[in-house]
Amino acid sequence: PLDGERVGEMVYIDLLNRARHSVHIITPYLILDGELETALRFAAERGVDVHLILPGKPDKVFAYALAKTHYLPLLSSGVKISEWTPGFTHAKVMIMDGQEAVVGTINLDYRSLYHHFENAVWMRGVDCLPRIEADFQDTLAQCRTVEPTRQSVWQGKKLLHLVGMVLKFIAPLI
């Protein structure tokens, strides 16, 4: 963060822009800026299978509420969202076309991308990529699919919805 470079976000956006078939992501937090949200949506709109796995049970209610404010715009563009039902997942993984992956400490949230000292490993053409994809699929098997409806996203939690909408105005601070 001290050099002003947004390396983590730029790598994620680059993978999304170069993807031809799939981008599979597991992240505990989803607090997106416009550029990253646009890259996710654009990839899905051009036919890439973009699939996010997020926690079904939050560790931070405010971050959870804020993440859900991104669901409907993403879903409306064809991004698939699933929530891991056994509990909270803290994995940070992105795998693109089964050929490249990023695994590390970088969350898909503003603080992680802009303010924290995070790191990750970018991999291409290495033997562990099939295992990373298999782990995504195994995790997906334990998920609830989020449908592109308010009811599916918010599950009748009106207070959580209200909190999320209010927090969206101060998202960069969270």
Name each region found by the language model.
Residues P1-I174:
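Charged, low-complexity intrinsically disordered terminal segments
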